[in-house]
């Protein structure tokens, strides 16, 4: 009842306050349906009915649609298109098959006929050859018979007849023997290829019949001289013909008669040539004309620069596109500058103009699909550099990412660069194309010839363990004891390596190689990263240390075999079995209780583990040395390294400090939010709006609708996700990431190598995947049950980690970072906390076989294990060379990993990512390890609520909880890439996480980036094309109304040299929800970014300069809001710094205020002084020290009051200053010497009115008693020199020498002391008036 009242009240409130209710009739029904769904969902939560969970999840999926659900729609459309294409192709294939069958039958008939003809020809040739070869012999036989007949002329006829009959019988008998002997020789003739197909009985009969007939014909010919001559001539011709015929037949036999296969191939080649010619003509016609294929309901129209695929002609008629322009120019206010000077940076821009010419309104979404990158290393040689760019592009093989994560994974070494291949050859790596038997034969030959050739290679040497003859002294017992006690598995091993002995020379060498810090250089191609075999003493130390710590019956000796070898080949099986037998033989000689040795193989990672029984101790370690040397003699040609297994433990905080309590009430630090640039300003998609007007308009829109957008994003997610999730998901902005791209993709697998997991947990069962038993795992059924099938979690650590990564989004428990991915939990911990490197490597091999792109490792050790190092290194060859990401926890000892490294977190491979823990106060957790050179990123690891066995939940703390957060974000990035149709490079995914992370400036413990992982920024960057291609965020999604257009800039910013390919897909959907119309525009892009290639033009041609006007379509408001707030950094509010800033701010304001007052007063005083100066020039009111009496001043003031009135100052300014000085201002310039002659008396009198003349007379009269002072003050006004502010000296001495020197007297008479040509004579009152008028004008100016 309460629920009904609650829902009804909400509907009424919505009805009252919603303005557009009257215009929308369907609004009420839609709101009732929405609240009904919420009510049903709430009832399920209250009832907690587990049986109803499946229907709840189905409702959840139907109502949950991410912002970029277009990928799902596009995938379904592509699936439909392929089905129709397959159907139409099937019909076409049936017709083609019929044609092919008819053609094949015709070919077979022709071949059979040709075979019969050839066989018949061969019969004729053989018969002729036999006939010719037997004719002479048979003739001699008949001659003998005829001679015997002619000797008895005298006998009667009867006697002759009997004798003739007997001779004929003998003749037939000898003829048969003659023919059989010739046929026997024919069978032994190697020149006859098809002799087994001949019927020799048939040949015998034919030859015998021909010879007899020929003999009878010759007997009928009677003698005579002419006839005999003819016969001899004939026989001679036959003999010559026989010789010629024999040569011809032998030549034919040597060349060989064409076989059936050859004839068939010739026929097929002829037919294929015909088909190629016809197809070539078809392809040329297709290139010249646009094609239009209608596969049922799917229409495909091909243009020069793009292809349209749709199920409706409306899109073809309404939408027009221009995708041909490639330019570096900017579009109006969207400025993307191009750096002409820096050739190392590359930008490519394509401007797409989309227009709607129809009557419908469409929703437009941009996507990228099938991106590919091909490294240029090894594609072309020096000779190929002469070729053009187009020819080089054609040589680049397109890699089809089929099946993606399906099937069985392998290690692909084909993409090794030239430097890597050279390094593997230096290490003794085998060419995968070379047969191992050939390699062994070469090794044997080298060993046999070793007496004459001293070789340093591994194949020519073998170990000789002999303490008496060893050149290098064995370490002392004390030194060995110290080494044993201070054993540490630092990767910087000693340079002591195994000592090799040349067998025949009996000379000894120390095989020394540069150690190289394997984790001090990210470049795997560095020649310093050479692997060396641990010497036997180190192996013995490892064995004794493991014996001390672990009481087991067997120890695991792991041998890392070369990656290119096939361990399942017969040769490698024989090599391993022989090594095993030799080792067993040695053990049986020294230990009677010993039975046999077992071993384990892991492929494709190529690790061999031999289980050594614990029969050795400190007393018989020499026997262990000898056993290891025997093993090395058998396998050193195939081994890269070897060592005994190490022990690893999980990272879970052992304790929680008081200040780390859950109920900590200490004040939290505050931070300010500042937007960050993902790329350089010239490439950033956040720095496109440079004009002020678009910025102001856009800000107004955002400010007016910001609150509504925030509510829309918040209400987008189901209530359960917000209720059951904790602070850790909100701090890394997972909600907005789900809003953009969804919960993930089931095809993406995350491999959790830990203590196992509860496979029956309600929050894990839906996402956990248990791989079926396969022989490729190469493990026993018991070991398979232990690691894969039933990974029982005794500690709960693995279950907790698994729940953080991918807890199912249901109505119970918690939600993981990526709730819709596939989880593979593998147990390598054999107890509650510890596990060996053999189990860890075996688990990594299972991850490789299952094509898992992400591996979580919330465990580690301070001992460097070379086996694990090599196993992690080989992860970069998974997924067809793309590589797998290894996310590792940094550790919980609050140590600096730069000084005290933990492994595998500090393996410096580009696909390994180390994670530290951060608290909810945006500080590195007190327990977390850090490292300015070894720890990459921060993630929540403080008080994380997640799953534990038996359907329970618990709070754990540690960096083990931080690493799975980064795994989950990586899974979201891989999910977006899967939707786009490709597998990204492992380094590129980690680079995206780094560049989009939130900078935490206030951290005291430093890391490489000092930043927090940002799920929203990483997903958004991947959706916009990744690192090298950036579609502007504001142009990715918008509505295209009738008559509108849109300019879409796409910027490519290549950060690696190579070949980039992708397809920009523009999805077109009508706004009408009932419409099933859908279309896509595919724009292929291919860029070569190696400036060293000839004919490479880094700067594309100049294109059109577009201008954005009012006809431009509007951006999507929600997406634009996300784009503005997706990438930012946090800066801490420092209270002391803030207080100091406030004080300085107010001091600045105060100083500005005081300065303004001072300037105002200064300006007022200057104005007053200028007026007083004018007055003082005509009214001699001087300062203190004037000789004028107070009574004289009062008289003068009284006179001016009578003259100008009471308002003396105002009238004086108006009547005297303006009228008197304005006329002369035009003719008199400041700083110049006045010309007293240029004005006449009349002019001066006209310009000087009566009041001014009176004033001048008063001034002259009053100057009588102080002429010296007055003269100086009157002439002081001439000391200003215009704009140049140049001062002139107008004292008495200078004036008398250069210009004028006036002398005033009581009679108002001016006399000149020195007479010059240019001086003025003053002799009367008129002259005085004239001179004083000129002086007045000068002073006024």
Curated annotation (Swiss-Prot):
Primary residence: membrane
Recorded name of the encoding gene: SUB2
InterPro entries in UniProt: Peptidase_S8/S53_dom, Peptidase_S8/S53_dom_sf, Peptidase_S8/S53_subtilisin, Peptidase_S8_His-AS, Peptidase_S8_Ser-AS, Peptidase_S8_subtilisin-rel, Pro_sub2
Signal peptide: 1-18
Residue ranges, compositional bias (Low complexity): 430-474, 517-530
Extracellular side: 687-1136
Cytoplasmic topological domain residue ranges: 1158-1341
Carbohydrate-modified residues: 165, 343, 449, 453, 492, 550, 641, 728, 820, 856, 892, 950, 1009, 1105
Effect noted on mutating residue 960 to A: Loss of the first autocatalytic maturation cleavage. Impaired microneme localization and accumulation in a ER-like secretory compartment
Lineage: Eukaryota, Sar, Alveolata, Apicomplexa, Aconoidasida
Any one GO CC term of the record: merozoite dense granule
PTM remark: Proteolytically cleaved at the N-terminus to generate a 74kDa intermediate which is further processed into a 72kDa form. The first maturation cleavage is autocatalytic, occurs in the ER and is necessary for the subsequent SUB2 trafficking to the microneme. The second cleavage may be mediated by PMX/plasmepsin X.
One term of GO molecular function: serine-type peptidase activity
Composition bias, Basic and acidic residues: 502-515
This protein's UniProt keywords: Autocatalytic cleavage, Cell membrane, Cytoplasmic vesicle, Glycoprotein, Hydrolase, Membrane, Protease, Serine protease, Signal, Transmembrane, Transmembrane helix, Zymogen
Domain notes for this protein: The propeptide domain acts as an intramolecular chaperone for the folding of the catalytic domain. Also acts as an inhibitor of the catalytic domain thereby regulating SUB2 activity during secretion.
The organism of origin for this protein: Plasmodium falciparum (isolate 3D7)
Chain positions covered by the region annotation Disordered: 85-107, 143-171, 415-474, 499-530
Catalytic residue list: 754, 797, 960
Propeptide, residue positions: 19-686
Activity regulation comment: Activation may be calcium-dependent. Inhibited by the non-covalent interaction with the cleaved propeptide.
Biological role: Serine protease which plays an essential role in the shedding of AMA1, MSP1 and MSP7 from the surface of the invading merozoite; this step is essential for productive invasion and the release of the adhesion between the erythrocyte and the merozoite. May cleave TRAMP/PTTRAMP, thereby shedding TRAMP from the merozoite surface during erythrocyte invasion.
Name of the protein: Subtilisin-like protease 2
GO biological process: membrane protein ectodomain proteolysis; protein maturation; protein processing; proteolysis
Topology with respect to the bilayer: Single-pass type I membrane protein
TM helices/strands, residue ranges: 1137-1157
